Amino acid sequence: MGVGVGYKEVGGEPTAHLGVTVLVRKKVEPHRLPRSHHVPYELGGVPTDVVEVGDLVLFTRTGRVRPLVPGVSIGHWRGGAGTLGAVVRDKRSGQLMLLSNNHVLANGTDGRDGRAQRGDPIRQPGTYDGGTEADTVAHLDRFVPLFRAGAGTRAYCPVARGVEKIADRVVSALRPGYGVHVYPRRSRENVVDAAVARPLPGVSLDPTVLEVGQVTGIAEPRIGLEVLKSGRTTGLTRGRLRVLHAAVRVAMSATEWAFFTEQLVFTAMGLPGDSGSLILTPEGKAVGLLAAGSDRATIACDIRRVLELLDVELA
């Protein structure tokens, strides 16, 4: 697979002897190889070593990745593509599940608008990245409703809808071509943008975050905390926590927005498609779930609230 220079290893530990390192896909006992394939103990008096590296492939975040690993493209079959944030364990069943944003796995639904429902197909890669029905890896299991406001948000209240129908008929009779719609006076607050999906039988999972490593626990958010994330669009980026307990309004479309409280504000460390990324300390401790941002800031939900509301734990 390759060759280079490195310290000879014994029992997986480096020694003080620098030599030629031969990289192989898989180590094989010498007696099972033709003599011409044997690596000599020395080359011109320089010691050699053989290191197993497996199959070397280019990291892909927007293509098909198996086993599933956090940091790659994923999404609801109707939606675009976001990032698989983490592998979590369902506290109810003990089964491993996939964690990302509601707007990634559940199409931004509040549970009543028809955008998504439990059991919907989840694709890896996401539909925007070319994912098809054949790329279905999970089914939507549960989500925290995502409430929005704006011109596209109709009222669910039966009384309001009844008034709307009557007023609409009156206005239409007086002024054909015109109508009446009733909207909520104030949007409900959101604390997290989060959902989990249940993998299909036979779909293998690797909880190791791409280019980051194992998730080692949860860190207490504090201003100035140095963090990193692994996302579908911008890959591995680093940032710093700037604001705690933020209340922010996030655009959901040209005419709708969602109001969030208890948010974490970081320096800019993502772009569209990075939504759902797990934000961690360099030591691998989870801090937040990336949900929104701009070219100047990144907004994330506190991972503790995410896990609590979905009744899951980090795997």
Identify the function of each model-found stretch.
Residues T60-Q263, T267, L280-E283, A291, ...:
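Serine endopeptidase catalytic core focused on the charge-relay Asp
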Residues L271-D274:
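Short, small/polar residue-rich loop motifs at catalytic or cofactor-binding pockets
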Residues A286:
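Glycine-rich acetyl-CoA-binding "A-motif" of GNAT/NAT acetyltransferases
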Residues M1-V88:
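Noncatalytic regulatory segments and standalone regulatory/sensor domains
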